[in-house]
């Protein structure tokens, strides 16, 4: 976890980055044989707790488009690993015709989404390896922050 980055006004804020988008080659490999994708990203735990968008979602959408895949939709959810909140938000979020869901978050978010949908779910990000607590999950699930997500 990267800490103590300077804020725009010069004050110090914590950087809670816990994951990063997988490399382009690995994503291209995972995308093989998939289409009609829904992309969901955790909008917190990626950086400073500010109201800004998760940056990897746009980058992943670009890669998916370049691979010739159809995106059925995308969403950014605060604290994706919070099962109660995510379940409520996901109910009507994923459009009919979606065949695969790609999750941009740490392993907790991937596992939370996988438990809630009836299509294959893939990790599009790797957790950053650090000591400390991952996510805000109130379950027994865990993310080992291994820096190479093997949930696919």
Describe each PLM feature range.
Residues 2-152:
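Iron-sulfur-associated redox domains of electron-transfer enzymes in respiratory
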């Amino acid at each position: 976890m990267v800490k103590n980055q300077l804020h725009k006004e010069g004050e110090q804020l914590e950087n809670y980055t816990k994951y990063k988008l997988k490399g382009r080659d690995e994503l291209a490999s995972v995308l093989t044989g998939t289409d009609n994708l829904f992309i969901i990203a955790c909008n917190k735990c990626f950086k400073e707790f500010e109201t800004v968008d998760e940056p990897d979602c746009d980058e992943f959408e670009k890669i998916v488009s370049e691979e010739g895949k159809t995106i059925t939709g995308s969403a950014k959810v605060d604290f994706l690993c919070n099962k109660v909140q995510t379940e409520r938000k996901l109910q009507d979020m994923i459009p009919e015709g979606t065949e695969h869901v790609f999750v941009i978050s740490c392993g907790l978010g991937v596992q939370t989404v996988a438990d809630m949908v009836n299509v294959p779910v893939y990790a599009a990000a790797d957790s950053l390896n650090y000591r400390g607590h991952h996510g805000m999950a109130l379950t027994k699930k865990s993310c080992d922050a291994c820096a190479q997500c093997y949930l696919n």
